Amino acid sequence: MXKAVAVLTGSEGVXGTIFFTQ
């Protein structure tokens, strides 16, 4: 799940990194 969220928000970059850490 986390990975999926990181990829989806990867467009923003910053949000993707934060979600990936969570």
UniProtKB/Swiss-Prot annotation:
What this protein catalyses is:
2 superoxide + 2 H(+) = H2O2 + O2
Q: Which cofactor does it need?
A: Cu cation; Zn(2+)
The UniProt keyword set, sorted, is: Antioxidant, Copper, Cytoplasm, Metal-binding, Oxidoreductase, Zinc
The signal peptide here is none
Q: Where found in the cell?
A: Cytoplasm
Annotated TM spans: none
Which is an annotated GO molecular function term of this record?
A: metal ion binding
Q: Which GO terms describe its cellular component?
A: cytoplasm
User: What EC designation does it have?
Assistant: 1.15.1.1
Q: How is the cofactor bound?
A: Binds 1 copper ion per subunit. Binds 1 zinc ion per subunit.
Q: How does it assemble?
A: Homodimer.
Family classification: Belongs to the Cu-Zn superoxide dismutase family.
What does the record give as the function of this protein? Destroys radicals which are normally produced within the cells and which are toxic to biological systems.
Name of the protein: Superoxide dismutase [Cu-Zn]
Report the source organism.
Hordeum vulgare
